[in-house]
Amino acid sequence: KRQWENDEWSERISFDDVLERVEPDGTAPFDIKYADMKLGNKCDLACLMCNPGDSSKWIPDYNKLMKSDIDQETKNILEWRKEEGRLNWYRHDSVFWKDIQSKLDTMESFYIIGGEPTINSEFESFLEMCVKSGHSGRINLRFNTNGLTTPERHLELYKRFKNVLIHLSIDGIGSYHDLIRYPSTWQEL
């Protein structure tokens, strides 16, 4: 995936193009073309490699672990900084959503991560906002998913985008998948 991203961005804008746009005062007026957005930690899996910051499904186990008899050094390593609103700030930030909406006419690409975007209501609202703006047909959409949920409404909305690239997270097959991507089963996937 990283090599694909490097190739993709190497063709966007050259260093010389950037220098040409820099004003004498050092400012460089650019339209925003790309955004990475993490829409919280809501997820339906508790994968081995995740933590509460990336998967809400991990929170009960994390809380139990932190109450158990483990040494302070291990607790410090495992500490999850759960400042109020840190993971779901976007839900209550109307300025953020208005700003995104105002930039849709110049946006070329969005990359969405979660949690699991397909079960996040803000992901669907974001898709609808892009479509309603009339600019979705020129926007490339990429997102990561565990592949367990594909709402019909999303499928209809995807058709309105220029391109939709779905990164399906699979870390093993059979019993390896079942262990790593708990509580999903390979058969279910």
Regions found by a protein language model. Give the residues of each.
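Flexible, acidic/Gly-rich N-terminal and inter-domain linker regions that tether
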Residues: 1-33, 53
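Local cysteine-cluster metal-coordination motifs and their immediate loop/turn environment
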Residues: 1-2, 42-52
